[in-house]
Amino acid sequence: YNMKHNEKNGWENTDGDNNGNSWNCGAEGATDDPEIEGLRRRMVKNAFATLMCSRGPAMFFAGDEFCNTQFGNNNSYCQDNITSWLDWNRLEEYKEIHDFFRYMIRLRKDNAILRKTTKPAACKLPEISIHNGFPWNGGTDNNSRLIGIMYAGRDENDIRDDIVFYCMNAYWETLIMQLPELPMGMQWKVCVNTFLPYEDGKNVEEQTEFYYKKSLKVPPRTVMILIAEENQ
């Protein structure tokens, strides 16, 4: 939805927040357009991947894991009906989103550096660094469409360095991200690419791959997450 739809609340749609900063991807409300529906699902994944790569307690609304919309109503306090109820039957229709949520939660749990400050990385990389298209170029402005954030620190067991690279392309065309160089003996591994099509029955983890190039093509409106692992 581009705007709130609180008409059924009885206040002529004057109640509720007007600053939702939302985008309907090309159609208001439900649609049978596969391109719009596909883009919406990708944007949901982008938002959740960003949340799971953010410090502090990660909070989201119940029902986000199966694309609950409340039919655009953002103030459903007076709606004791299907507007505010959680329809768990949507889990089957949005299995793709539910699987992605589970995977991202597990990824966050497995990489403590995404959740909190840990001991400094033995490789001397900074805890958090910003890479605006080029390694160590931290400048951003309102026209920026591509951003990379690298997290580095010791893992929770103080056995190895935990290095994660988050990248978002908010533009409608593919952009190039130059990847920062890793310590000797380590290689980037792509573990999240929200642009990839969902294949029912195939684990998200099975779509991961090692990445040996110095630059990364980031598809339109896509989040990619890479993790540093030992060369194989």
Task: Give the ranges of each region predicted by the language model.
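Carbohydrate-interacting/catalytic domains
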Residues: 31-45, 50-60, 64-232
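Alpha-amylase-like alpha-glycosidases and glucanotransferases acting on alpha-linked glucans and related
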Residues: 1-36
